[in-house]
Protein backbone atom coordinates (compact mmCIF):
# COMPACT_ATOMS: atom_id res chain seq x y z
CA UNK A 1 0.00 0.00 0.00
CA UNK A 2 1.26 3.48 -0.92
CA UNK A 3 1.13 4.96 2.54
CA UNK A 4 1.57 8.70 2.95
CA UNK A 5 3.76 8.07 6.00
CA UNK A 6 6.10 5.68 4.18
CA UNK A 7 8.86 8.26 3.99
CA UNK A 8 8.73 9.01 7.69
CA UNK A 9 8.74 5.34 8.67
CA UNK A 10 11.54 4.42 6.29
CA UNK A 11 13.58 7.40 7.41
CA UNK A 12 13.11 6.44 11.07
CA UNK A 13 13.92 2.77 10.57
CA UNK A 14 16.82 3.61 8.26
CA UNK A 15 18.24 6.09 10.80
CA UNK A 16 18.05 3.59 13.65
CA UNK A 17 19.35 0.83 11.39
CA UNK A 18 22.37 2.93 10.41
CA UNK A 19 23.00 3.80 14.06
CA UNK A 20 22.92 0.17 15.22
CA UNK A 21 24.81 -1.01 12.14
CA UNK A 22 27.60 1.50 12.65
CA UNK A 23 27.82 0.54 16.32
CA UNK A 24 28.01 -3.17 15.55
CA UNK A 25 30.33 -3.23 12.57
CA UNK A 26 32.57 -0.22 13.17
CA UNK A 27 32.39 0.60 16.88
CA UNK A 28 31.65 -2.73 18.59
CA UNK A 29 32.52 -1.43 22.03
CA UNK A 30 29.70 1.11 22.08
CA UNK A 31 26.44 0.32 23.94
CA UNK A 32 24.07 -0.06 21.97
CA UNK A 33 0.25 -4.99 1.79
CA UNK A 34 2.51 -5.07 -1.09
CA UNK A 35 2.34 -2.49 -3.81
CA UNK A 36 1.20 -4.09 -6.97
CA UNK A 37 0.31 -2.87 -10.42
CA UNK A 38 -3.42 -3.21 -11.09
CA UNK A 39 -4.48 -5.23 -14.10
CA UNK A 40 -4.67 -3.17 -17.29
CA UNK A 41 -4.00 -0.06 -15.19
CA UNK A 42 -2.83 2.95 -17.12
CA UNK A 43 -0.45 4.31 -14.49
CA UNK A 44 0.08 8.01 -15.01
CA UNK A 45 -1.11 7.59 -18.58
CA UNK A 46 -3.51 10.06 -20.12
CA UNK A 47 -5.52 9.32 -23.24
CA UNK A 48 -5.09 11.41 -26.38
CA UNK A 49 -8.56 12.82 -25.79
CA UNK A 50 -7.58 13.88 -22.28
CA UNK A 51 -4.31 15.45 -23.40
CA UNK A 52 -6.17 17.58 -25.93
CA UNK A 53 -8.48 18.79 -23.17
CA UNK A 54 -5.57 19.67 -20.92
CA UNK A 55 -3.59 21.54 -23.54
CA UNK A 56 -6.50 23.34 -25.18
CA UNK A 57 -8.80 23.74 -22.19
CA UNK A 58 -11.77 22.95 -24.45
CA UNK A 59 -14.31 20.15 -24.17
CA UNK A 60 -14.48 17.61 -26.96
CA UNK A 61 -17.59 17.49 -29.10
CA UNK A 62 -20.14 14.88 -28.04
CA UNK A 63 -23.80 14.01 -28.36
CA UNK A 64 -24.49 15.92 -25.15
CA UNK A 65 -22.18 18.65 -24.01
CA UNK A 66 -22.10 20.03 -20.48
CA UNK A 67 -24.25 23.11 -19.99
CA UNK A 68 -22.88 26.45 -21.07
CA UNK A 69 -23.81 29.04 -18.47
CA UNK A 70 -23.01 32.73 -18.20
CA UNK A 71 -21.89 32.92 -14.57
CA UNK A 72 -22.44 36.68 -14.30
CA UNK A 73 -26.19 36.24 -14.97
CA UNK A 74 -26.75 34.12 -11.85
CA UNK A 75 -28.75 35.97 -9.21
CA UNK A 76 -28.10 34.93 -5.59
CA UNK A 77 -31.69 35.66 -4.49
CA UNK A 78 -32.92 32.89 -6.81
CA UNK A 79 -30.95 30.35 -4.79
CA UNK A 80 -32.85 28.26 -2.26
CA UNK A 81 -31.26 26.72 0.81
CA UNK A 82 -32.28 23.83 3.01
CA UNK A 83 -30.85 22.01 6.03
CA UNK A 84 -30.80 18.45 7.31
CA UNK A 85 -29.68 17.75 10.89
CA UNK A 86 -28.85 14.23 12.08
CA UNK A 87 -27.24 12.89 15.24
CA UNK A 88 -23.80 13.74 13.84
CA UNK A 89 -24.32 15.98 10.78
CA UNK A 90 -25.52 19.46 9.95
CA UNK A 91 -25.83 19.70 6.16
CA UNK A 92 -26.66 22.84 4.20
CA UNK A 93 -27.96 22.40 0.64
CA UNK A 94 -28.14 24.91 -2.19
CA UNK A 95 -30.29 24.87 -5.31
CA UNK A 96 -27.43 26.56 -7.16
CA UNK A 97 -25.62 23.54 -8.53
CA UNK A 98 -27.93 21.16 -6.67
CA UNK A 99 -25.21 20.53 -4.13
CA UNK A 100 -24.15 20.33 -0.51
CA UNK A 101 -22.99 23.89 0.11
CA UNK A 102 -21.68 23.28 3.65
CA UNK A 103 -21.11 20.12 5.65
CA UNK A 104 -20.65 20.22 9.42
CA UNK A 105 -19.98 17.46 11.93
CA UNK A 106 -20.84 17.65 15.62
CA UNK A 107 -20.32 15.49 18.68
CA UNK A 108 -22.18 12.20 18.44
CA UNK A 109 -22.74 8.94 20.28
CA UNK A 110 -20.69 5.94 19.16
CA UNK A 111 -22.02 2.42 18.55
CA UNK A 112 -21.27 1.44 22.15
CA UNK A 113 -22.97 4.48 23.66
CA UNK A 114 -19.77 6.46 24.22
CA UNK A 115 -19.64 10.18 23.43
CA UNK A 116 -17.29 10.94 20.53
CA UNK A 117 -16.21 14.56 20.71
CA UNK A 118 -15.65 16.11 17.31
CA UNK A 119 -16.08 19.83 17.99
CA UNK A 120 -12.85 19.98 20.00
CA UNK A 121 -10.87 22.83 18.49
CA UNK A 122 -12.21 26.16 17.21
CA UNK A 123 -15.78 24.91 16.66
CA UNK A 124 -18.30 27.03 14.79
CA UNK A 125 -21.77 27.91 16.01
CA UNK A 126 -24.36 26.77 13.48
CA UNK A 127 -27.98 27.86 13.90
CA UNK A 128 -30.75 25.80 12.30
CA UNK A 129 -34.44 26.54 12.99
CA UNK A 130 -33.48 28.65 15.99
CA UNK A 131 -31.33 25.93 17.60
CA UNK A 132 -27.57 26.38 18.02
CA UNK A 133 -25.00 23.64 17.48
CA UNK A 134 -21.24 23.47 18.01
CA UNK A 135 -19.63 21.80 15.01
CA UNK A 136 -16.62 21.73 12.69
CA UNK A 137 -16.98 22.36 8.97
CA UNK A 138 -15.52 19.67 6.72
CA UNK A 139 -16.36 21.20 3.33
CA UNK A 140 -13.84 24.08 3.34
CA UNK A 141 -16.56 26.67 2.54
CA UNK A 142 -16.79 25.15 -0.95
CA UNK A 143 -19.28 22.32 -0.48
CA UNK A 144 -19.55 18.97 -2.25
CA UNK A 145 -21.27 19.25 -5.63
CA UNK A 146 -21.43 15.71 -7.11
CA UNK A 147 -21.64 17.19 -10.61
CA UNK A 148 -20.36 16.02 -13.99
CA UNK A 149 -17.82 17.68 -16.26
CA UNK A 150 -16.57 16.68 -19.69
CA UNK A 151 -13.35 18.67 -19.38
CA UNK A 152 -10.54 17.99 -16.92
CA UNK A 153 -9.83 21.68 -16.50
CA UNK A 154 -13.37 22.11 -15.14
CA UNK A 155 -13.53 19.23 -12.67
CA UNK A 156 -13.08 21.54 -9.68
CA UNK A 157 -15.83 23.87 -10.87
CA UNK A 158 -18.35 22.07 -13.05
CA UNK A 159 -20.63 24.14 -15.33
CA UNK A 160 -23.53 22.45 -13.53
CA UNK A 161 -22.54 24.43 -10.42
CA UNK A 162 -24.02 27.52 -12.13
CA UNK A 163 -27.39 25.98 -12.97
CA UNK A 164 -30.37 26.50 -10.69
CA UNK A 165 -31.87 23.13 -9.75
CA UNK A 166 -35.35 22.64 -8.42
CA UNK A 167 -35.19 21.66 -4.74
CA UNK A 168 -37.61 19.29 -3.00
CA UNK A 169 -37.52 18.49 0.72
CA UNK A 170 -38.80 15.36 2.42
CA UNK A 171 -38.48 16.00 6.15
CA UNK A 172 -40.00 12.63 7.07
CA UNK A 173 -37.41 10.60 5.13
CA UNK A 174 -34.59 13.11 5.74
CA UNK A 175 -33.96 13.57 2.03
CA UNK A 176 -33.29 16.41 -0.39
CA UNK A 177 -33.89 16.05 -4.13
CA UNK A 178 -32.62 18.21 -6.99
CA UNK A 179 -33.45 18.20 -10.68
CA UNK A 180 -32.39 20.26 -13.69
CA UNK A 181 -32.69 19.95 -17.45
CA UNK A 182 -29.71 20.35 -19.74
CA UNK A 183 -29.72 23.59 -21.80
CA UNK A 184 -30.36 21.66 -25.02
CA UNK A 185 -33.34 19.92 -23.33
CA UNK A 186 -31.95 16.51 -24.29
CA UNK A 187 -31.77 15.05 -20.79
CA UNK A 188 -32.59 15.68 -17.15
CA UNK A 189 -30.21 15.32 -14.22
CA UNK A 190 -31.64 14.30 -10.84
CA UNK A 191 -29.91 13.92 -7.48
CA UNK A 192 -31.34 12.63 -4.22
CA UNK A 193 -29.48 12.84 -0.89
CA UNK A 194 -31.01 10.48 1.70
CA UNK A 195 -29.81 10.68 5.31
CA UNK A 196 -30.35 8.36 8.26
CA UNK A 197 -30.50 10.13 11.66
CA UNK A 198 -28.41 7.64 13.64
CA UNK A 199 -25.76 6.88 11.02
CA UNK A 200 -22.64 8.52 9.61
CA UNK A 201 -23.65 7.42 6.13
CA UNK A 202 -25.94 8.94 3.53
CA UNK A 203 -27.10 7.56 0.20
CA UNK A 204 -26.80 9.51 -3.02
CA UNK A 205 -28.76 8.56 -6.13
CA UNK A 206 -27.95 10.27 -9.44
CA UNK A 207 -30.34 9.77 -12.34
CA UNK A 208 -29.86 10.71 -15.99
CA UNK A 209 -33.10 10.70 -18.02
CA UNK A 210 -32.98 10.83 -21.82
CA UNK A 211 -35.62 13.33 -23.01
CA UNK A 212 -34.70 13.05 -26.68
CA UNK A 213 -36.08 10.70 -29.31
CA UNK A 214 -32.62 9.39 -30.10
CA UNK A 215 -30.01 7.40 -28.25
CA UNK A 216 -28.00 9.56 -25.89
CA UNK A 217 -24.29 8.88 -25.52
CA UNK A 218 -23.85 10.57 -22.16
CA UNK A 219 -20.39 9.08 -21.62
CA UNK A 220 -18.16 7.18 -24.02
CA UNK A 221 -14.49 6.63 -24.73
CA UNK A 222 -14.61 9.62 -27.08
CA UNK A 223 -16.59 11.73 -24.63
CA UNK A 224 -15.39 10.84 -21.14
CA UNK A 225 -17.39 12.18 -18.19
CA UNK A 226 -15.85 13.13 -14.86
CA UNK A 227 -17.91 13.05 -11.67
CA UNK A 228 -16.48 15.03 -8.79
CA UNK A 229 -17.60 13.49 -5.50
CA UNK A 230 -15.89 14.89 -2.40
CA UNK A 231 -13.47 17.78 -2.72
CA UNK A 232 -10.54 18.32 -0.39
CA UNK A 233 -11.66 17.80 3.18
CA UNK A 234 -11.44 20.05 6.22
CA UNK A 235 -11.09 21.33 8.78
CA UNK A 236 -8.22 23.63 7.89
CA UNK A 237 -6.82 26.82 9.43
CA UNK A 238 -8.82 29.81 8.22
CA UNK A 239 -6.72 32.47 9.96
CA UNK A 240 -3.49 31.78 8.05
CA UNK A 241 -2.20 30.22 4.83
CA UNK A 242 -1.66 26.48 4.79
CA UNK A 243 1.92 25.52 5.65
CA UNK A 244 3.77 22.52 4.23
CA UNK A 245 3.11 20.70 7.49
CA UNK A 246 -0.61 21.46 7.15
CA UNK A 247 -0.86 20.24 3.56
CA UNK A 248 0.80 16.95 4.51
CA UNK A 249 -2.38 16.10 6.45
CA UNK A 250 -4.70 16.29 3.43
CA UNK A 251 -4.92 13.36 1.06
CA UNK A 252 -7.10 11.43 -1.37
CA UNK A 253 -7.43 7.70 -1.80
CA UNK A 254 -9.03 5.07 -3.99
CA UNK A 255 -9.42 1.32 -4.31
CA UNK A 256 -8.82 0.26 -7.90
CA UNK A 257 -8.20 -3.18 -9.35
CA UNK A 258 -7.91 -4.77 -5.91
CA UNK A 259 -5.25 -2.33 -4.71
CA UNK A 260 -5.59 0.54 -2.23
CA UNK A 261 -3.67 3.72 -3.02
CA UNK A 262 -3.47 7.11 -1.38
CA UNK A 263 -1.60 10.29 -2.18
CA UNK A 264 -1.32 13.84 -0.94
CA UNK A 265 -3.60 16.48 -2.40
CA UNK A 266 -1.99 18.20 -5.34
CA UNK A 267 0.51 15.43 -6.09
CA UNK A 268 0.62 12.19 -8.03
CA UNK A 269 0.64 8.77 -6.42
CA UNK A 270 4.36 8.27 -6.96
CA UNK A 271 5.81 5.81 -4.47
CA UNK A 272 8.88 6.30 -2.29
CA UNK A 273 11.37 4.45 -4.47
CA UNK A 274 9.94 6.03 -7.64
CA UNK A 275 10.50 9.40 -5.99
CA UNK A 276 14.13 8.44 -5.31
CA UNK A 277 14.52 7.47 -8.96
CA UNK A 278 12.93 10.72 -10.11
CA UNK A 279 15.35 12.66 -7.90
CA UNK A 280 18.45 11.11 -9.48
CA UNK A 281 17.08 11.20 -13.03
CA UNK A 282 15.81 14.76 -12.75
CA UNK A 283 12.23 13.70 -13.46
CA UNK A 284 9.70 15.61 -11.39
CA UNK A 285 7.29 12.67 -11.48
CA UNK A 286 4.39 15.00 -12.29
CA UNK A 287 4.92 15.90 -15.95
CA UNK A 288 1.17 16.12 -16.52
CA UNK A 289 -1.34 18.31 -14.75
CA UNK A 290 -3.70 15.33 -14.61
CA UNK A 291 -3.26 11.59 -14.61
CA UNK A 292 -5.97 8.97 -14.98
CA UNK A 293 -5.88 5.55 -13.34
CA UNK A 294 -8.15 3.00 -14.99
CA UNK A 295 -9.05 -0.65 -14.67
CA UNK A 296 -11.60 -2.00 -17.14
CA UNK A 297 -12.01 -5.35 -15.40
CA UNK A 298 -12.88 -4.41 -11.82
CA UNK A 299 -13.11 -0.61 -11.90
CA UNK A 300 -13.12 1.69 -8.90
CA UNK A 301 -14.39 0.10 -5.70
CA UNK A 302 -14.44 3.38 -3.76
CA UNK A 303 -12.72 6.76 -3.67
CA UNK A 304 -12.51 9.63 -1.25
CA UNK A 305 -10.57 12.38 0.45
CA UNK A 306 -9.21 12.79 3.94
CA UNK A 307 -7.78 15.19 6.46
CA UNK A 308 -5.93 14.58 9.69
CA UNK A 309 -8.91 13.26 11.65
CA UNK A 310 -11.67 12.77 9.07
CA UNK A 311 -12.37 10.98 5.81
CA UNK A 312 -15.09 11.26 3.18
CA UNK A 313 -15.61 8.32 0.86
CA UNK A 314 -18.00 7.59 -2.01
CA UNK A 315 -18.70 3.90 -2.64
CA UNK A 316 -20.57 3.06 -5.89
CA UNK A 317 -23.19 0.46 -4.95
CA UNK A 318 -24.68 -0.61 -8.28
CA UNK A 319 -21.86 0.09 -10.72
CA UNK A 320 -18.10 0.44 -11.06
CA UNK A 321 -16.64 3.65 -12.52
CA UNK A 322 -14.03 3.14 -15.22
CA UNK A 323 -11.27 4.98 -13.37
CA UNK A 324 -10.20 7.91 -11.24
CA UNK A 325 -8.61 11.29 -12.00
CA UNK A 326 -5.60 12.52 -10.06
CA UNK A 327 -5.27 16.29 -10.23
CA UNK A 328 -1.55 17.01 -9.89
CA UNK A 329 -1.81 20.79 -9.95
CA UNK A 330 -0.28 22.39 -6.84
CA UNK A 331 -2.77 23.32 -4.12
CA UNK A 332 -5.71 21.93 -6.10
CA UNK A 333 -8.87 20.96 -4.21
CA UNK A 334 -10.42 18.68 -6.84
CA UNK A 335 -10.60 15.72 -4.47
CA UNK A 336 -12.02 12.37 -5.60
CA UNK A 337 -13.06 12.49 -9.27
CA UNK A 338 -14.51 9.38 -10.95
CA UNK A 339 -14.26 8.56 -14.66
CA UNK A 340 -17.19 7.28 -16.75
CA UNK A 341 -16.89 6.20 -20.39
CA UNK A 342 -19.86 3.90 -20.99
CA UNK A 343 -23.27 5.47 -20.31
CA UNK A 344 -25.62 5.02 -23.26
CA UNK A 345 -29.35 5.75 -22.91
CA UNK A 346 -32.23 4.81 -25.19
CA UNK A 347 -35.02 7.35 -25.70
CA UNK A 348 -36.89 7.86 -22.43
CA UNK A 349 -34.46 5.65 -20.50
CA UNK A 350 -33.47 6.43 -16.90
CA UNK A 351 -29.85 5.61 -16.00
CA UNK A 352 -29.23 5.43 -12.24
CA UNK A 353 -26.02 5.66 -10.19
CA UNK A 354 -26.22 4.85 -6.47
CA UNK A 355 -23.53 5.71 -3.92
CA UNK A 356 -23.03 4.98 -0.25
CA UNK A 357 -21.25 8.00 1.21
CA UNK A 358 -19.47 8.12 4.54
CA UNK A 359 -18.16 11.24 6.23
CA UNK A 360 -16.69 10.93 9.69
CA UNK A 361 -13.74 10.16 11.89
CA UNK A 362 -10.93 7.89 10.76
CA UNK A 363 -11.89 5.17 13.20
CA UNK A 364 -13.93 1.97 13.06
CA UNK A 365 -16.33 3.45 15.64
CA UNK A 366 -17.35 6.05 13.08
CA UNK A 367 -17.94 3.57 10.27
CA UNK A 368 -19.92 1.12 12.39
CA UNK A 369 -23.68 1.03 11.84
CA UNK A 370 -25.90 1.55 14.88
CA UNK A 371 -29.08 0.25 13.30
CA UNK A 372 -28.66 -3.42 12.25
CA UNK A 373 -31.41 -2.99 9.64
CA UNK A 374 -29.17 -0.50 7.82
CA UNK A 375 -26.03 -2.61 8.12
CA UNK A 376 -25.60 -4.48 4.81
CA UNK A 377 -23.62 -7.20 6.57
CA UNK A 378 -26.67 -7.98 8.73
CA UNK A 379 -29.64 -7.10 6.54
CA UNK A 380 -30.29 -7.95 2.90
CA UNK A 381 -32.83 -5.14 2.78
CA UNK A 382 -30.32 -2.47 3.75
CA UNK A 383 -30.21 0.53 1.38
CA UNK A 384 -26.43 0.13 1.49
CA UNK A 385 -26.30 -3.37 -0.01
CA UNK A 386 -23.18 -3.47 -2.16
CA UNK A 387 -21.04 -1.56 0.35
CA UNK A 388 -17.40 -2.50 -0.15
CA UNK A 389 -15.98 -4.92 2.41
CA UNK A 390 -12.64 -3.13 1.99
CA UNK A 391 -13.98 0.26 3.04
CA UNK A 392 -12.15 0.10 6.37
CA UNK A 393 -8.88 0.36 4.43
CA UNK A 394 -9.72 4.04 4.00
CA UNK A 395 -8.15 4.70 7.41
CA UNK A 396 -5.78 1.74 7.57
CA UNK A 397 -2.29 2.67 8.77
CA UNK A 398 -0.48 -0.36 7.35
CA UNK A 399 1.28 -3.07 9.33
CA UNK A 400 1.32 -1.00 12.53
CA UNK A 401 -2.49 -0.74 12.65
CA UNK A 402 -2.92 -3.49 15.30
CA UNK A 403 -0.30 -1.80 17.52
CA UNK A 404 -1.93 1.59 16.96
CA UNK A 405 -5.41 0.33 17.81
CA UNK A 406 -4.11 -1.51 20.86
CA UNK A 407 -2.29 1.58 22.15
CA UNK A 408 -5.36 3.76 21.65
CA UNK A 409 -7.52 1.25 23.52
CA UNK A 410 -5.06 1.10 26.44
CA UNK A 411 -4.75 4.90 26.59
CA UNK A 412 -8.54 5.25 26.61
CA UNK A 413 -8.87 2.77 29.48
CA UNK A 414 -6.16 4.53 31.48
CA UNK A 415 -7.88 7.85 30.78
CA UNK A 416 -11.22 6.42 31.86
CA UNK A 417 -10.18 4.66 35.07
CA UNK A 418 -7.32 6.85 36.36
CA UNK A 419 -6.53 10.50 35.67
CA UNK A 420 -8.66 11.93 32.83
CA UNK A 421 -5.70 13.45 31.04
CA UNK A 422 -3.90 11.87 28.10
CA UNK A 423 -0.53 13.24 29.19
CA UNK A 424 -0.71 11.23 32.41
CA UNK A 425 -2.13 8.32 30.43
CA UNK A 426 1.02 8.32 28.29
CA UNK A 427 3.26 8.37 31.36
CA UNK A 428 1.34 5.48 32.96
CA UNK A 429 1.48 3.61 29.65
CA UNK A 430 5.27 4.15 29.53
CA UNK A 431 5.59 2.71 33.05
CA UNK A 432 3.44 -0.30 32.15
CA UNK A 433 5.48 -0.88 29.00
CA UNK A 434 8.66 -0.73 31.06
CA UNK A 435 7.31 -3.25 33.56
CA UNK A 436 6.14 -5.67 30.87
CA UNK A 437 9.58 -5.67 29.25
CA UNK A 438 11.48 -5.47 32.53
CA UNK A 439 13.53 -8.66 31.89
CA UNK A 440 14.77 -7.33 28.55
CA UNK A 441 15.41 -3.87 29.96
CA UNK A 442 17.29 -5.34 32.91
CA UNK A 443 19.37 -7.42 30.55
CA UNK A 444 20.18 -4.22 28.69
CA UNK A 445 21.16 -2.47 31.93
CA UNK A 446 23.38 -5.40 32.98
CA UNK A 447 24.99 -5.40 29.55
CA UNK A 448 25.74 -1.68 29.84
CA UNK A 449 27.30 -2.21 33.26
CA UNK A 450 29.52 -5.03 31.98
CA UNK A 451 30.61 -2.82 29.11
CA UNK A 452 31.63 -0.13 31.60
CA UNK A 453 33.66 -2.65 33.60
CA UNK A 454 35.60 -3.51 30.46
CA UNK A 455 36.34 0.15 29.80
CA UNK A 456 40.03 0.06 30.95
CA UNK A 457 40.79 -2.97 28.77
CA UNK A 458 38.98 -1.42 25.82
CA UNK A 459 41.00 1.76 26.28
CA UNK A 460 44.22 -0.27 26.18
CA UNK A 461 43.14 -2.01 22.97
CA UNK A 462 42.20 1.30 21.35
CA UNK A 463 45.57 2.84 22.20
CA UNK A 464 47.59 -0.23 21.20
CA UNK A 465 45.92 -0.69 17.83
CA UNK A 466 45.12 2.94 17.09
CA UNK A 467 46.52 2.62 13.55
CA UNK A 468 45.11 -0.83 12.82
CA UNK A 469 41.28 -0.71 12.83
CA UNK A 470 40.93 -4.32 11.70
CA UNK A 471 43.07 -5.70 14.51
CA UNK A 472 41.43 -3.32 17.00
CA UNK A 473 38.02 -4.69 16.11
CA UNK A 474 39.26 -8.29 16.26
CA UNK A 475 40.77 -7.85 19.73
CA UNK A 476 37.68 -6.05 20.94
CA UNK A 477 35.42 -8.88 19.83
CA UNK A 478 37.73 -11.41 21.48
CA UNK A 479 37.45 -9.44 24.73
CA UNK A 480 33.66 -9.43 24.50
CA UNK A 481 33.58 -13.16 23.80
CA UNK A 482 35.92 -13.93 26.68
CA UNK A 483 33.76 -11.97 29.13
CA UNK A 484 30.45 -13.22 27.67
CA UNK A 485 29.34 -9.74 26.58
CA UNK A 486 27.10 -9.13 23.57
CA UNK A 487 27.86 -5.65 22.17
CA UNK A 488 24.40 -5.39 20.61
CA UNK A 489 22.58 -7.07 23.48
CA UNK A 490 21.15 -3.76 24.61
CA UNK A 491 19.57 -3.00 21.24
CA UNK A 492 16.62 -5.40 21.51
CA UNK A 493 14.46 -3.14 23.72
CA UNK A 494 14.99 -0.31 21.23
CA UNK A 495 14.08 -2.55 18.28
CA UNK A 496 10.89 -3.61 20.08
CA UNK A 497 9.98 0.04 20.60
CA UNK A 498 10.14 0.90 16.88
CA UNK A 499 6.61 -0.37 16.07
CA UNK A 500 5.41 1.21 19.34
CA UNK A 501 6.94 4.51 18.28
CA UNK A 502 5.38 4.36 14.81
CA UNK A 503 2.02 3.35 16.29
CA UNK A 504 2.20 6.23 18.76
CA UNK A 505 2.97 8.61 15.92
CA UNK A 506 -0.06 7.48 13.92
CA UNK A 507 -2.25 7.46 17.05
CA UNK A 508 -1.43 11.05 17.93
CA UNK A 509 -1.52 12.16 14.31
CA UNK A 510 -5.03 11.05 13.37
CA UNK A 511 -7.00 9.94 16.44
CA UNK A 512 -9.85 12.30 17.27
CA UNK A 513 -9.78 11.45 20.99
CA UNK A 514 -6.26 12.83 21.38
CA UNK A 515 -6.86 16.00 19.37
CA UNK A 516 -6.40 19.20 21.40
CA UNK A 517 -5.46 17.28 24.59
CA UNK A 518 -3.39 19.48 26.97
CA UNK A 519 -0.75 18.42 29.51
CA UNK A 520 1.10 20.77 31.86
CA UNK A 521 2.53 23.48 29.56
CA UNK A 522 1.69 21.49 26.40
CA UNK A 523 -1.46 22.88 24.78
CA UNK A 524 -2.06 20.00 22.37
CA UNK A 525 -0.41 16.57 22.62
CA UNK A 526 -1.11 15.98 18.93
CA UNK A 527 1.09 18.96 17.98
CA UNK A 528 4.69 19.98 18.76
CA UNK A 529 4.88 21.88 22.07
CA UNK A 530 5.99 25.24 20.69
CA UNK A 531 6.57 27.55 23.68
CA UNK A 532 8.04 30.42 21.68
CA UNK A 533 8.26 31.43 18.04
CA UNK A 534 10.94 33.70 16.66
CA UNK A 535 10.14 36.64 14.38
CA UNK A 536 10.15 36.00 10.66
CA UNK A 537 13.63 35.59 9.21
CA UNK A 538 14.01 37.26 5.78
CA UNK A 539 14.91 34.89 2.94
CA UNK A 540 14.60 31.93 5.33
CA UNK A 541 11.14 31.68 6.86
CA UNK A 542 8.05 33.88 6.88
CA UNK A 543 6.59 32.37 10.03
CA UNK A 544 9.63 32.24 12.29
CA UNK A 545 11.15 29.23 14.03
CA UNK A 546 9.38 27.54 16.93
CA UNK A 547 11.12 26.47 20.13
CA UNK A 548 9.95 23.02 21.20
CA UNK A 549 10.83 22.45 24.85
CA UNK A 550 9.84 18.80 25.08
CA UNK A 551 12.04 17.85 22.12
CA UNK A 552 15.00 19.54 23.84
CA UNK A 553 14.25 17.69 27.08
CA UNK A 554 14.11 14.43 25.16
CA UNK A 555 17.53 15.04 23.63
CA UNK A 556 18.92 16.09 27.01
CA UNK A 557 17.82 12.83 28.62
CA UNK A 558 19.18 10.92 25.61
CA UNK A 559 22.61 12.54 25.98
CA UNK A 560 22.62 11.95 29.75
CA UNK A 561 21.68 8.30 29.28
CA UNK A 562 24.39 7.84 26.64
CA UNK A 563 27.09 9.38 28.82
CA UNK A 564 25.89 7.34 31.79
CA UNK A 565 26.35 4.07 29.91
CA UNK A 566 29.35 5.02 27.75
CA UNK A 567 32.64 3.21 27.82
CA UNK A 568 36.12 4.16 26.63
CA UNK A 569 35.80 5.59 23.16
CA UNK A 570 38.03 6.76 20.36
CA UNK A 571 37.40 10.18 18.74
CA UNK A 572 35.17 8.71 16.02
CA UNK A 573 32.91 7.10 18.61
CA UNK A 574 32.69 10.34 20.56
CA UNK A 575 31.58 12.11 17.40
CA UNK A 576 28.89 9.45 16.87
CA UNK A 577 27.70 9.90 20.45
CA UNK A 578 27.02 13.59 19.79
CA UNK A 579 25.72 13.22 16.23
CA UNK A 580 22.99 10.77 17.24
CA UNK A 581 21.16 13.21 19.58
CA UNK A 582 21.18 15.83 16.81
CA UNK A 583 19.69 13.23 14.51
CA UNK A 584 17.02 12.39 17.10
CA UNK A 585 16.29 16.09 17.59
CA UNK A 586 15.67 16.47 13.86
CA UNK A 587 13.28 13.49 13.85
CA UNK A 588 11.35 14.58 16.94
CA UNK A 589 11.25 18.34 16.35
CA UNK A 590 7.91 18.34 14.54
CA UNK A 591 6.55 15.15 16.06
CA UNK A 592 3.31 15.22 18.08
CA UNK A 593 4.38 16.14 21.60
CA UNK A 594 2.61 13.03 22.93
CA UNK A 595 5.17 10.85 21.13
CA UNK A 596 8.04 13.00 22.42
CA UNK A 597 6.63 12.82 25.96
CA UNK A 598 6.53 9.02 25.77
CA UNK A 599 10.12 8.77 24.51
CA UNK A 600 11.38 11.30 27.06
CA UNK A 601 9.78 9.45 29.95
CA UNK A 602 11.16 6.16 28.64
CA UNK A 603 14.62 7.76 28.78
CA UNK A 604 14.00 8.90 32.36
CA UNK A 605 12.89 5.40 33.38
CA UNK A 606 15.93 3.86 31.66
CA UNK A 607 18.24 6.30 33.46
CA UNK A 608 16.65 5.36 36.78
CA UNK A 609 16.91 1.64 36.07
CA UNK A 610 20.55 1.96 35.00
CA UNK A 611 21.41 3.98 38.12
CA UNK A 612 19.80 1.36 40.38
CA UNK A 613 21.63 -1.43 38.52
CA UNK A 614 24.98 0.35 38.86
CA UNK A 615 24.35 1.09 42.55
CA UNK A 616 23.41 -2.51 43.35
CA UNK A 617 26.44 -3.75 41.42
CA UNK A 618 28.77 -1.50 43.42
CA UNK A 619 27.19 -2.61 46.69
CA UNK A 620 27.63 -6.24 45.69
CA UNK A 621 31.28 -5.64 44.77
CA UNK A 622 31.95 -3.95 48.14
CA UNK A 623 30.47 -6.92 49.98
CA UNK A 624 32.67 -9.31 48.00
CA UNK A 625 35.72 -7.15 48.72
CA UNK A 626 35.06 -7.29 52.46
CA UNK A 627 34.77 -11.07 52.33
Curated annotation (Swiss-Prot):
Instruction: Write out the transmembrane intervals.
Output: 8-28, 417-437, 488-508, 536-556, 575-595
Which Pfam family would be a valid example here?
60KD_IMP
Keywords (alphabetical) are:
Cell inner membrane, Cell membrane, Chaperone, Membrane, Protein transport, Transmembrane, Transmembrane helix, Transport
Recorded GO terms, molecular function? membrane insertase activity
Subcellular location, in the record's words?
Cell inner membrane
Q: Where along the chain is composition biased (Polar residues)?
A: 33-57
Put simply, this protein is called Membrane protein insertase YidC
| Species the sequence originates in | Leptospira interrogans serogroup Icterohaemorrhagiae serovar Lai (strain 56601)
Amino acid sequence: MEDRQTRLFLALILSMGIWMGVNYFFFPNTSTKKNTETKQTQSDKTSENTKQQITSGKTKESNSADPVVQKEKITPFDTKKSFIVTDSYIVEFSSLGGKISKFYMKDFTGPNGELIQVARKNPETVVVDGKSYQAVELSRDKGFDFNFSDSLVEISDSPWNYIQFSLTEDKINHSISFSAVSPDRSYQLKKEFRFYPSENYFKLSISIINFSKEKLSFASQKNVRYLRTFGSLGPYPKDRPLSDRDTANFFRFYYLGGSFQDTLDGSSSVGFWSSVGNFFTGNSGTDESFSIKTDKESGVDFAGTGSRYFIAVADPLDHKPHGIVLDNRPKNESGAVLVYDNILLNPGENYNLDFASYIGIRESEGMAFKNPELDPSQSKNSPFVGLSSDLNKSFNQGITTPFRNGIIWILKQIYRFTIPNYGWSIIIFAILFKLVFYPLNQKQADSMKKMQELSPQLKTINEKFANDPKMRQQKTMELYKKNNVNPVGGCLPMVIQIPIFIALYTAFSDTIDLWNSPFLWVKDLSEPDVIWTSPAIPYFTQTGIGLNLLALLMVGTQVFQTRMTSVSMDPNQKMLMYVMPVMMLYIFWNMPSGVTLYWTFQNVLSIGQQWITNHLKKTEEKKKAKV
